[in-house]
Amino acid sequence: MSRAEHVAWCKQRALEYVDAGDLQNALASMGSDLNKHPETANHPGIKLGLMLMMTGNLSTRDEMRRHIEGYN
């Protein structure tokens, strides 16, 4: 699987959680799945997402969706 295909797969899975209203697991899924591919492991967006969530900046579905869709 290419890097781009893997990122698309990660986004799809994470957005399923967003659609269900489960924002914590959306972010956890994205981070966990990104770490499963050698070219996306330790992606800087993982730490950024955690910081944003801890400071209340990923508290709505729209905020989380924008964050997840921004990964590349």
Report each predicted region and the residues it spans:
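Alpha-helical linker/edge segments of TPR/alpha-solenoid repeat scaffolds
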Residues: L52-N72
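N-terminal acidic leader/helix
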Residues: M1-G31
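Short, charge-rich amphipathic alpha-helical segments embedded
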Residues: A28-M53
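Short, flexible helical or helix-coil boundary motifs
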Residues: Y17, G21, L34-A41, N57, ...
